[in-house]
Amino acid sequence: MNIIKYFRLQNGRVPFDEWLRVLRDPRAKTKIVQRIDQLALNNPGDHKPCRQGVWEMRIDEGPGYRIYYAHEGKDTYLLLLGGDKRKQQADIDQAVAWWKERQESENEI
């Protein structure tokens, strides 16, 4: 089983968790949680690479929900951000920036 982690900003906020908490559609929330469970089992389903190490999981529900994540080591996934098709490019840009920030902070001594 893989490890699922959540990206945390320097101020302590967890963007993915905040996004999921404000979703009003209970069916969509259920599908999103199921997909995270699948990811833990190394079965992400409908997904594709975006750029610079960030991947997108697509959930066919509502406005086309997305989960942006990256691989941290062999068996760890870092959930960066959630969003939907309407803001896809801006969400990808933000996820890439946060992933880059995470990698840079990991390399600091």
Regions found by a protein language model. Give the residues of each.
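Enriched for short, Lys/Arg-rich terminal
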Residues: 1-9, 26-29, 44, 59-66, ...
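Short, solvent-exposed recognition patches
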Residues: 11-47
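Beta-strand-connecting loop/turn residues
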Residues: 12, 52-53, 74-75
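Acidic, low-complexity intrinsically disordered regions
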Residues: 15, 51, 94-95
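A short, surface-exposed loop/turn module that caps and links secondary-structure elements
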Residues: 34-59, 106-109
